[in-house]
Amino acid sequence: MIKETDLENIPDLLVKFNEPLSKYTYTKVGGPADILAFPATIEALTELLVKAKSTDTAVTVLGNASNLIVRDGGIRGLVILLEKLESVKVAGYTIEAQAGAKLKEVTQVAQANSLTGFEFACGIPGSIGGAVFMNAGAYGGEISQVLVSCKVMDTDGNISVLTASEMQFGYRHSVIRDKNLVVLSAKFELQAGDPTQIQNEMNRLNFLRESKQPLEYPSCGSVFKRPVGHFAGQLIQEANLQGVRIGGVEVSKKHAGFMVNVANGNATDYEKLIAHVIDKVKENSGVTLEPEVRIIGEK
């Protein structure tokens, strides 16, 4: 296990011990990380991973902790949050963004530079790293449509670049998940557009999101993947599950595809409610819902 003294001499690194992850997750649930680290440079991240490897320390890397539930027992070993790796650069029609850059901010950079194609992501919570990891998407667009390459690091600290085809994108899936890689940055190829039209489209999508999604409460975003031929929210509605609550977490009355933390709920409440919804939807429609949200950590 990595020791505090192992981390003291790594520059550009903030470290916290026994830190509640509920302070950082969008759901506002999650037990403590043994060690929580915030590298501000690629060099700091590299050194951190090398130290973890040499001390046989388990590593969990998080982007912006949005489409995620951390269990109440927390996460053992080292947890790395990439939120300080947030630079965004523009060159011609290409945007390169580091893993910790927020999607919303990257879409604003695209608009300011008259680049279109990234509008779909303007309301998706979370970071570039997390979005690439799960091929995030909304309103007919997804990351795989605009990504041209991705810089990644393995657990030994080796850096490589994957092309879009090497990313093996699927629905809410990429090779990053399979190979335990860390996203460092991603390059996106966009097209020339009119900044006013781009902003109008982003305004339209944000209005749709705000009118349909329960943004007033903590949540993990969309809980379930879209089943083939169906909509998860519609199936949940048809099973009369809207408003059903376990502990402090309920199926949103505004959008059945969301579960919101309305009364200081915990991760156990989320897991129980997810299991309950899966059972009842299966019973009502015969369709088995598959969670889109990642659930990690110890109970």
Swiss-Prot record:
Its cofactor is FAD. It is found in: Cytoplasm. GO terms for biological process: cell division; cell wall organization; peptidoglycan biosynthetic process; regulation of cell shape. Its main location: cytoplasm. Residues 28-193 form the FAD-binding PCMH-type domain. One of its GO terms (cellular component) is cytosol. It holds the Pfam family FAD_binding_4. Pathway: Cell wall biogenesis; peptidoglycan biosynthesis. Its EC number is 1.3.1.98. It catalyses: UDP-N-acetyl-alpha-D-muramate + NADP(+) = UDP-N-acetyl-3-O-(1-carboxyvinyl)-alpha-D-glucosamine + NADPH + H(+). The active site is at R172, S222 (proton donor), E292. Keywords: Cell cycle, Cell division, Cell shape, Cell wall biogenesis/degradation, Cytoplasm, FAD, Flavoprotein, NADP, Oxidoreductase, Peptidoglycan synthesis. One of its GO terms (molecular function) is FAD binding. It is an enzyme of class 1 (oxidoreductase). The keyword Cell cycle applies. PANTHER family: UDP-N-ACETYLENOLPYRUVOYLGLUCOSAMINE REDUCTASE. Belongs to the MurB family. Cell wall formation. This is UDP-N-acetylenolpyruvoylglucosamine reductase. The gene is murB.
